[in-house]
Structure formats: structure tokens, C-alpha cells
Amino acid sequence: MLILGIDTSCDDTSVAVLENRNILSNIVSSQIKFHSKYGGIVPEIASRKHIEWIWDVTEKALSEAKTDLKDIDLIAVCYGPGLIGSLLVGLCFAKSLSYASGKPLVGVNHIEGHIQAIFLEKSYPEYPFLCLIVSGGHTSLYRVNDFGAYKELGRTRDDAAGEAYDKVAKMLGLGYPGGPVIDALAKEGCNEKFNLPRPYLHGSLDFSFSGLKTAIKVLLKNLGYKEGNVPDEIKKDIAASFQTSVVDVLIEKIKWAISSEKLNRVVITGGVAANSELRRRAEMLKDKGINVYLPSKSLCTDNAAMIAITGYNKFLKGEISDLFLNARAYLPL
């Protein structure tokens, strides 16, 4: 079966073609250069770029997969959560293709897509397993009992981890997005230079990163530096200290979840799962007998392949969406 996957949930226009569970193409067109000067994503710009690019990206995905639209058997599309204007572009496009071709349509939850991304890899866990989704919009822990059977164990109470990265990067004058540049700078800094808080929220598997962000703001003030005007060496040390604090919390929460759920299989996914320090620390958990699974970096960030495989699995269970499917900015799993 050939599946066409479409994801326009945020600022990446992505289209993929899968043959069952095998990736034939997975095209991602990034809008970063259009948003970076604003320090974050501008929803209207994101929507307009999706409209401009969606057909070209689809043609590229089909071409790379050496197939044609008429050969596609199933169309899977992300319908939430995300930016409503962005979601509507991909959803309306997918519904139009479905209507014109008569091919079945399956709507996919973006968060479920991140969880299922690991099954695109050669190495993946048996059910049940724990899953940490950590990205710019989400930081949540789930117990995954089976496909479609998810129990939320904890979530962020304020800023998601990726959002905290972006906000700290802005304070340091590093631009947008903050994750990759902080990750790179942290390798050159001392992570013990500044003693930043670790918001563990003892007794809970929830997350909270707003206090850590505030601690950086106070630190800059105490050091006598204005936001956006910080010496390079200080930037490096703050980046290293901040990243260590975030990763410490994420790893500790995983350990707590393993203990409470009596499970030693863990998937870490989402855009922040591409972070080198988080991946390094996650690999170290294997020394403690914990089975850790990380998608390749290209499958951690937003992509349509994860939407396609999730749609495929839903289709196999007999789940099909109609043309009245609506985009949902907020969509619980």
C-alpha cells in the first residue's frame, strides 16, 4: 500500500510517501528564514508559505518516491494540534486530493505521529512502553499500552522545553530557533559556571520550565548585561548551564516514570529529542538496563512520514475520516 502523508501543523511544509512502513520519500520544506527576523513563528506568514509550497513539495515527494498521485492508496493528514491556519492548508489540500481521486482519507493527531515515528526505524520497542515527547509546543510523558491506547503521565504546566530554549536564546541574542544554536554553544561552555534551578516538581511527572527561564533573566540582570547584549564567553556558559538543567529534569522524570510504571522501555521523540546532550544522556540510561529508543534526528522534528505511518495503522484498524474533518488547534491525544 502506498500512503501519502501531509503535515503543515506549524512552520514546516512536509509531504511523504510510504510503502506500508517503508519511507520512499520524506520532504520537509523549512520556513525558518522567513520567521527568524521576528524571533518566532508568525502564523499568517506560515499559512501563506504553506499555500505557496504545498503542491511543489507534494510533487517532489512523489517524484523522489518514483510514483504518481494516481498510484497512491491512502492519504493521511495532520489535523491538529497546531497553528489553525497552517493546519487548514494541509487539511484542505488533503481533502481536495481525496475528493478528486476517491482515495480514502485518515486524519492524524500530530502528537500520536511523534509517538509512532519510532516504528519507522529498524529498532523499535514492543508495547507497552513509555514515551517522552519534547518539542517547542509539547513536553509530555505517556504510557503507550498499544497503538491508539495512550495514558498521559505528565505534561508541562507552562513553557514546553523547546519554547524555553527559544526564549532563552532570544535573551542571549542568539536568534530563532534557539534549540540548535544553544546546543552548539553549550559544547563550548562550562555547565557548572552558573548554578541554575532544576524544576523537578517532586512527587509529580509534570514539567515546568518558566522558572528556569526567569532565572536566566535574573542572572543577566545580576551580571549587569542587557538582554540581547551578552559577551560570547558568558553566552557559552549560560547555554551550557541552561541545557544541563533542562536535560537533568527530562532524564530524572524518565527515571521516575520507569519506577512508577515498572517499565524499562522508553522512547524519546519530538524536536528537542534531536538535541545532542539529551541524546547522549539518554544513551547513558542503557548502562542501567533501560531500553532507550530514539528516532533519527530527521524523524524527531516535524515530518510527514510520521503522519503517514500513523494514518496507515489507523486505516488497518478500519478508521477512515470523512470530508467533514475539521482542523483542531487544540487536540488532546
UniProtKB/Swiss-Prot annotation:
Question: Where does the protein principally reside?
Answer: cytoplasm
What is this enzyme's catalytic activity, as reactions?
L-threonylcarbamoyladenylate + adenosine(37) in tRNA = N(6)-L-threonylcarbamoyladenosine(37) in tRNA + AMP + H(+)
Keyword hit for tRNA processing: yes
Concerning Pfam families, the annotation shows: TsaD
Q: Which cofactor does it need?
A: Fe(2+)
Amino-acid positions noted as binding substrate in the UniProt annotation, renumbered to this chain: I133, V134, S135, G136, G137, D166, G179, D183, N275
Keyword list, A-Z = Acyltransferase, Cytoplasm, Iron, Metal-binding, Transferase, tRNA processing
Q: Name one GO molecular function term.
A: iron ion binding
Q: Where in the cell is it found?
A: Cytoplasm
Q: Name one GO biological process term.
A: tRNA threonylcarbamoyladenosine modification
Origin superkingdom: Bacteria
Q: Name one GO cellular component term.
A: cytoplasm
Q: What is this protein called?
A: tRNA N6-adenosine threonylcarbamoyltransferase
**Encoding gene, per UniProt annotation:** tsaD
